[in-house]
Amino acid sequence: MILISVTAVAGIGCIIAAFVMGADPRQIRNYAEGKTSGKLQTEERNIRADQIRKLNIDIGSGNVKLQNGNQDHLIIKKKGSWEPVILKSDGEIEIKQKSRHFKLFWFQSNDEITVILPKGVTFEKVSMDCGNGDIASDSLNITDELVIDCGSGDIDLTTITTSKTEIDLGSGDVTLTMAGTEKDYNYNIDCGNGDVKIGDILFEDDLKKRNINALRWINIDCGSGDLTIDFDNTIL
């Protein structure tokens, strides 16, 4: 009984704090309802692989999963607060959490979304901006560029095929499996207090490395997080 009373008082105190910070009562109600509903929604979009050129993921504390499907259109499974997933005029699909106009420490996001990609999709560019959420993906085929900006979250990507990879890592963890071998890539590494492991080699200092005949680039700016890059040893 005492624990319940203390929890209730703490919750009321946080709501009062939200009012003091200028939050609209409707924002508080909608935010709380969105956090407690937990209802999984499945949506199907008439978006085919040949219509998709780019993918942009922008999350704060939510979780994103990308899966490769056998269907000819996009399928979305989500719960929590997300912007509608649509195809823009330039062929970009954006996965984005709805904006929060205020934040309270006792609200922990449980937003999650799974995007099942249509069979055979190839992207020109994929961008991932992750605060303290998590992003995981099946294999991705990217012709031009993969851009990762990771704060304190975790990103785990399997079998990435791309010409150029840009990684800006704060205090989170990023794990990538790249197509090919270590010798298929050139590297620019700017390493802070974190660890960068490429294949079997651990890098703790800045480095620029060029491999003979390598045409692909990985550019790394690592803060205090950990980056691990492995290879699937396929022939490119």
Language-model region placement:
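Hydrophobic membrane-insertion alpha-helices, especially the h-region
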Residues: I2-A18
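Short linear S-[DN]-x-LW-Φ motif typified by the pepsin-like aspartic protease active-site region
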Residues: A17-K98, I116, T122, I135-L140, ...
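Residue-level preference for beta-strand/loop junctions
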Residues: A49, S109, I212-A214
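Short, surface-exposed interaction patches in beta-rich subdomains
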Residues: L140, V147-C150, D154-L236
